[in-house]
C-alpha cells in the first residue's frame, strides 16, 4: 500500500514538474483595444468576434437547464455563451457567497469549447430589482426603493441609495475575485455585463425626498464639462434639449436640460451606481465590462415606458460622462430598426456589441451588417435552449446557417474591419441593391426569397482582398458583377457579360483559403443559396 501511495506521489510530482521547472507564459487578459479609430476585443492577444448564444433568464440556476442551454449553444455553432449569475443565489445571506452555480457555468462553457460572457443580474433586471437577494428586498429602510410621482414605492432600488450600491459592488467584487482565482489561467470568461437593462420602469425618475433634493440641485460639473467638451457631437435629442436651455454650464437639472431633465437625472445616477459596481469588479479582475440597453420602442412617448435612465440613445453621452469604468454600451434588439439604431451605438467612443437579439428567423442575417458594416464586436440571439418546434426551431436553423458562413471568416473579417474593404448586404423591401466597390466595380444584388417582415432575410458580406479578388459570402443572395468602366449593355445580357474570371467555392482556415469546387458552365454564377456559401470571385479588369 505504501509503495502504491509513493508511486502515486511520484507521478503527481512528475506531472507538476513543468510548473516548477519552466516558466509558463500566462494568457493575456481579454481587453478592448482601440486602433486607428476602431475597437477590437482581444482574447489570448488576438482579435476575437463573438458569435454568441444567450440563455433564458433562469437556465443558469439549475444544472439540468444549463445542460440544455449548452446543447443550444452547440447546435447554433456559437463560439461564445452568455448566461447570468444571480446576486440572490450568489449571496443568499450578507457576506456568505455560494459559487457552485458560477463554477458549473464556467465548467459548462469549457466543456462546450466556447468562451463565456457573464451577465450580472443584481440591482437591475429589466428596470426592476427582481434578482436582489431576499435580505435586500426585506430591508426597505436600508435599501431604499424608488418612489413614483404619486408617492408609491416601486420594486426598484433607488439609484441614489449608497447602501444598495455598495452591497451590490461588494458581491460583484467577490464574483470577480472568484473568477480570477478559478479562470485566470483558462480565460474562459472574456466579457462581463454589469446589471441587465438598467433604469426605472414606470417612472421617469425617483420622486423620493432624497432624490428630489438632488434633482433640484445643480447638475454635476463633470456632466456640464462633458457637454461643453463634446458640443456638436452629442446625441441629437440631448443636444437639442441643452440648446433650448441656452447651453448653460450650470444650473439645476430642469434649467440645464429642460424636458429631458428627469431622464438625464436618472441616467446620471443609474450610470454612477453601475460605474461603482464595475469599478469594484475591475479592481478584483479587470475584464472588459459593458452595460446593455432596453431600447425605446415605436410608440413609447416618454421615459418610464422604457426604463428611464438606462443607456438608450437619448442619454448615451450622460452615461459616457458618468461611467468611465464601463467599457461600452450595448443595445438589445427586439425591433426591426436594427441598422438605424446600430449606427447610433457605433460611435468613435463606443464599439457596437449586440448581446441580445431576438431569436427569430427575421433577425439572423442582421449579423452580417453588425460585423461588416458597423465593425461590431459580436452578436447573440436570446433564449437558444432547443425546443424543436415552431418559430424558435426555425430561428435556430437560420442562425446556424448564418454562423456556419461567418465562423471560418472571423479572422478575415476582424482584419478588414475599419479598412473600407469590408461590406455588408442585407435584404430590404427593394428587389435589388447596388454595392459599389471603389470606382471600378459594382455588385448588383437580388434576393430569391420575397421580403417578409417575419421570415428570413438574404444577407451577406464582401471582402475586397484586391480590386479584382473578392470573397463573397452569405445566404440567399444572387450577385451580378459590373465593370463600371466598360460599355453599358442590355440588362438582359448582364449575366453573360460579367467581368468574371473564376468563381470557386471554399472556406478559410485562419486566413488561408481552402478551395472547393470551381463553378463554371451552367453554374458560373455568383449565387449564395439559402443554406449559405463562401465564394472566391476573381474579376477580369483590364
Predicted feature descriptions by range:
Residues 65-140, 270-284:
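Aromatic-lined substrate-binding rim segments of carbohydrate-active enzymes
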Residues 45, 81, 109, 175, ...:
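Conserved, mostly hydrophobic/aromatic
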Residues 142-316:
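Polysaccharide-binding and catalytic clefts of secreted carbohydrate-active enzymes
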Residues 22-79:
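N-terminal carbohydrate-binding accessory modules
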Residues 368-486:
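Aromatic- and carboxylate-lined catalytic core of secreted/periplasmic carbohydrate-active enzymes
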Residues 445-456, 462, 468-542:
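C-terminal beta-sandwich/jelly-roll accessory domains of carbohydrate-active enzymes
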Residues 114, 276-287, 313-411:
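Catalytic-core region of carbohydrate-active enzymes that cleave or remodel glycosidic bonds
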Residues 52-62, 84-102, 149-170, 254-271, ...:
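The substrate-binding groove and active-site-proximal loops of carbohydrate-active enzymes
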Amino acid at each position: 500500500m505504501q509503495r502504491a501511495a509513493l508511486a502515486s506521489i511520484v507521478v503527481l510530482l512528475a506531472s507538476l514538474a513543468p510548473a516548477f521547472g519552466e516558466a509558463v507564459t500566462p494568457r493575456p487578459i481579454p481587453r478592448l483595444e482601440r486602433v486607428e479609430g476602431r475597437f477590437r476585443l482581444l482574447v489570448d492577444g488576438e482579435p476575437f468576434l463573438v458569435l454568441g448564444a444567450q440563455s433564458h433568464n433562469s437556465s443558469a440556476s439549475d444544472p439540468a437547464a444549463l445542460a440544455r442551454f449548452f446543447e443550444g449553444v452547440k447546435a447554433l455553432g456559437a463560439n461564445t455563451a452568455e448566461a447570468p449569475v444571480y446576486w440572490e443565489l450568489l449571496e443568499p445571506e450578507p457576506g456568505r457567497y455560494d459559487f457552485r452555480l458560477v463554477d458549473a457555468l464556467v465548467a459548462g462553457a469549457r466543456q462546450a469549447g466556447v468562451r463565456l460572457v457573464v451577465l450580472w443580474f443584481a440591482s437591475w433586471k429589466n428596470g426592476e430589482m427582481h434578482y436582489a437577494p431576499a435580505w435586500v428586498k426585506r430591508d426597505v429602510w436600508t435599501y431604499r426603493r424608488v418612489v413614483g410621482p404619486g408617492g408609491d414605492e416601486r420594486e426598484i432600488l433607488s439609484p441614489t441609495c449608497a447602501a444598495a450600491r455598495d452591497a451590490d459592488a461588494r458581491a460583484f467584487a467577490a464574483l470577480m475575485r472568484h473568477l480570477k482565482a478559478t479562470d485566470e489561467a483558462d480565460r474562459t470568461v472574456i466579457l462581463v455585463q454589469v446589471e441587465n437593462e438598467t433604469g426605472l420602469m414606470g417612472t421617469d425618475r425617483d420622486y423620493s425626498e432624497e432624490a428630489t433634493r438632488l434633482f433640484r440641485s445643480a447638475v454635476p460639473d463633470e456632466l456640464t464639462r462633458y457637454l461643453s467638451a463634446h458640443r456638436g457631437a452629442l446625441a441629437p435629442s440631448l443636444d437639442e434639449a441643452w440648446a433650448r436651455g441656452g447651453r448653460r454650464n450650470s444650473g439645476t437639472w430642469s434649467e440645464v436640460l429642460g424636458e429631458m431633465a428627469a431622464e438625464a437625472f436618472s441616467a446620471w445616477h443609474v450610470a454612477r451606481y453601475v460605474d461603482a459596481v464595475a469599478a469594484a469588479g475591475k479592481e478584483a479582475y479587470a475584464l472588459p465590462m459593458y452595460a446593455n440597453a432596453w431600447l425605446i420602442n415605436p410608440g413609447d412617448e416618454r421615459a418610464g415606458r422604457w426604463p428611464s435612465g438606462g443607456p438608450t440613445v437619448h442619454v448615451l453621452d450622460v452615461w459616457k460622462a458618468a461611467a468611465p469604468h464601463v467599457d461600452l454600451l450595448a443595445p438589445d434588439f427586439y425591433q426591426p430598426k436594427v441598422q438605424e439604431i446600430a449606427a447610433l451605438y457605433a460611435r468613435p467612443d463606443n464599439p457596437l456589441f449586440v448581446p441580445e437579439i431576438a431569436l427569430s428567423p427575421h433577425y439572423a442575417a442582421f449579423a452580417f451588417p453588425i460585423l461588416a458594416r458597423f465593425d461590431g464586436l459580436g452578436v447573440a440571439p436570446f433564449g437558444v435552449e432547443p425546443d424543436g418546434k415552431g418559430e424558435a426551431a426555425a430561428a435556430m436553423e437560420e442562425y446556424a446557417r448564418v454562423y456556419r458562413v461567418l465562423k471560418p471568416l472571423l479572422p478575415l473579417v476582424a482584419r478588414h474591419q475599419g479598412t473600407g474593404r469590408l461590406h455588408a448586404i442585407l435584404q430590404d423591401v427593394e428587389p435589388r441593391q447596388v454595392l459599389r466597390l471603389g470606382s471600378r466595380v459594382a455588385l448588383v444584388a437580388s434576393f430569391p426569397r420575397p421580403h417578409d417582415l417575419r421570415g428570413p432575410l438574404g444577407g451577406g458580406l464582401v471582402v475586397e482582398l484586391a480590386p479584382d479578388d473578392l470573397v463573397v459570402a452569405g445566404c440567399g443572395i444572387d450577385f451580378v458583377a459590373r465593370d463600371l468602366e466598360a460599355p453599358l449593355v442590355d440588362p438582359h445580357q448582364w449575366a453573360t457579360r460579367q467581368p468574371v474570371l473564376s468563381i470557386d467555392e471554399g472556406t478559410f482556415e485562419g486566413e488561408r483559403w481552402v478551395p472547393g469546387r470551381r463553378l463554371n458552365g451552367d453554374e458560373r454564377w455568383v449565387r449564395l443559396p439559402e443554406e449559405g456559401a463562401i465564394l472566391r470571385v476573381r474579376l477580369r479588369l483590364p
